[in-house]
Amino acid sequence: MLKKILSLFKKEEPKTEEKPTEVEEKKEEREEKEEKKVRELTPQELELFKRAMGITPHNYWQWASRTNNFKLLTDGEWVWVEGYEEHIGKQLPLNQARAWSWEFIKNRLKELNL
């Protein structure tokens, strides 16, 4: 009798396909981003970035301290400061942002007629 009762509790319910959680989705997105070739900005790209952001010799150190001395990376779509990958795709005020899309940078250059 005891064995029969225990066997009732040991029965496994049929597993249903579970939807991925938000954490799993973010992990998958990060893995996809890591699969893309990430590299440092070329000197030409860095110069474009500086122009678009209005970085001049007068405010260089303010930006340099904020961006860890311009250790900027790109995957072809986004530019971000190394270590701030979580900022990619987020809309933050310009003075708090640590990731920018190339589209945003191009639009800034157009606005400034550069």
UniProtKB/Swiss-Prot annotation:
Residues 9-37 have a biased composition (Basic and acidic residues). Residues 1-37 are annotated as: Disordered. It holds the Pfam family Aq_1974-like. It comes from the Bacteria. Coiled coil: none annotated. InterPro entries: Aq_1974-like. This is Uncharacterized protein aq_1974. It comes from Aquifex aeolicus (strain VF5).
